Design a protein with these regions (language model features):
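Non-catalytic cap/lid and distal C-terminal segments of serine-dependent acyl enzymes
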Residues: 1-251
């Protein structure tokens, strides 16, 4: 902003982590109502405290990794709040694309006897696929009547994943699965910005983009050299510049 490469804007950073690792910006009585927190509380509080332009056309929702997943999901479900959305290496954008990863991670796995055992023994940096599976279960297939973890895991009894009620709950919050029923919301966005690294292969970004093309929904897609966490500062700056040019009419 000091170099006048960006227009004036207020950036609100949201912490979406939980004891399980990530909330995936879902509403859950066990880990918190992150969906409503982002779309209702944060918007209302920001407009009440700061010099905002309190209207849809001046709001963007963006995120990196899990945040990119959440941003795309929430702008579809809450179409009247945001006009721009940005997803930097949104993870995952297609739950089906990662199904085999989650299934393999959970196969033969002994379920921890407590949340402390889970968080102490299953760490993202050591076994991200298993840790991510538990985080998603806490967000998407919570079960308040099933202590001590209060969640259900998919791929347990059904040989047909598409008939597995737990897996179906995961798909209900899957950005790719939501496109067909929320195409009007996406089509009404002023801007959709997506990026991912050329070395990233498990996000489902390409599947999501094909779905946008299928419904003739406009978007901007940038592929950078590197992997998930590379060039984060540059990527955020590039996305913000993209939004800024739109808000200022190209100035």
């Amino acid at each position: 902003m000091e170099q006048r490469q960006l227009s004036e804007m207020i950036i609100v950073a949201i912490d979406g982590t939980t004891v399980f690792g990530g909330s995936y910006y879902a509403d859950s009585p066990t880990i918190g109502n992150f969906e409503r927190y982002v779309t209702e509380e944060v918007v209302s509080l920001t407009d009440s405290l700061f010099r905002t332009v309190p209207e849809k056309g001046s709001r963007a929702l963006t995120g990196f990794s899990m945040g990119g997943h959440g941003a795309l999901k929430l702008v579809m479900k809450y179409a009247g709040i945001y006009a721009q959305v940005g997803s930097l290496s949104g993870s995952p954008l297609s739950m089906r694309y990662r199904k085999s990863i989650y299934r393999k991670a959970l196969a033969g796995h002994a379920i921890p006897g407590s949340v402390k055992d889970l968080t102490g023994n299953i760490r993202y940096e050591e076994n991200w696929s298993l840790a991510a599976a538990y985080a998603k279960a806490a967000a998407f297939s919570l079960n308040p009547g099933k202590p001590p973890l209060f969640l259900d895991l998919p791929f347990g009894n059904s040989r047909d994943d598409e008939r597995d009620p737990v897996w179906q709950k995961w798909l209900d919050d899957d950005p790719l699965s939501l496109v067909s029923s929320h195409k009007e919301a996406l089509g009404g966005m002023d801007q959709i910005y997506l990026d991912h690294g050329e070395d990233e292969t498990t996000l489902g970004t390409e599947d999501f983009i094909r779905e946008l093309i299928r419904y003739d929904i406009g978007f901007t897609h940038f592929v950078f050299r590197g992997d998930h966490v590379d060039e984060l500062f540059l990527r955020h700056a590039r996305m913000l510049r993209y939004f800024s040019v739109f808000w200022t009419g190209g100035k």
